[in-house]
UniProtKB/Swiss-Prot annotation:
Belongs to the thiolase-like superfamily. Changing C85A: No change in activity. This is 17-hydroxy-3-oxo-4-pregnene-20-carboxyl-CoA lyase. Disulfide bonds: none annotated.
Amino acid sequence: MLSGQAAIVGIGATDFSKNSGRSELRLAAEAVLDALADAGLSPTDVDGLTTFTMDTNTEIAVARAAGIGELTFFSKIHYGGGAACATVQHAAMAVATGVADVVVAYRAFNERSGMRFGQVQTRLTENADSTGVDNSFSYPHGLSTPAAQVAMIARRYMHLSGATSRDFGAVSVADRKHAANNPKAYFYGKPITIEDHQNSRWIAEPLRLLDCCQETDGAVAIVVTSAARARDLKQRPVVIEAAAQGCSPDQYTMVSYYRPELDGLPEMGLVGRQLWAQSGLTPADVQTAVLYDHFTPFTLIQLEELGFCGKGEAKDFIADGAIEVGGRLPINTHGGQLGEAYIHGMNGIAEGVRQLRGTSVNPVAGVEHVLVTAGTGVPTSGLILG
């Protein structure tokens, strides 16, 4: 079993901005070198790299740019933000099996000044592959942006659970409260109120502007090695207690509308069941969580799928500041993708590490285990760190 075999020993990042002024390759190299410095390692110690299929920087290009030599392991993982925790899982599997000694997971993009994921891309319906076929079912009906695609599920969830726009807003308020205290966050010093959320414009009903993650230029990198080697390095090792991927039946990318139920994220439920089984833990053992928050409704649904509360009960679970620092389950203490930066979930993994190191700007008392999730609405992944 993978649990306890590998550890995160370094985290690194660029600044988070709306216009980096650098190439995506330079961003990747900067983050990788920053993470290695944090770990007390050099580029020549690295023999593995892993990233997203959506990343424009190949492993060999990053290796050249960062001064990394021979690679015995390299991989790319599909499904956008769903790959985030899986990059760490693959790195952990590589070092646990002896395929590599030190693996760096990275994600870099100019997602605001360059390719913007929220724009309509009609070319996706023209691809002569399975992606083109899938998109041809949803695009003609106006479901052509991530916000519109999530709005369909959010509306059904509201109907069945009784959740309201104000419940979604509670996630945004909590994230921005945490970001306001984080000098690295784009929205540092800029908290919001629930009234601000309710007054923000519609993007795709029932999603308002403040239900949607920001767009960011930047990069994050994570260094993974064996638990044995980690004990001799610079930082307190953060052990990978569990790591999982999940794809549910009848799965699509953001448009899984043909299942018996439209108000859940069963792929995240599958990830959760694996995480609890691998780690031997339960939701009650987790002191803080980093839940992928590209759109607020999916944060509520994740709480249910992961077992923190029953189906349809997330609106009550999060009430009265329960997901803020000092509450029963603080989430996204860095500010999340709504408040800190949208780096496809990789910055959330880094925050999990900081909580366990005791270096988070919004520390949660007595942290022993942190749950982190990757992108939702797609085949996804998750981690428990300790």
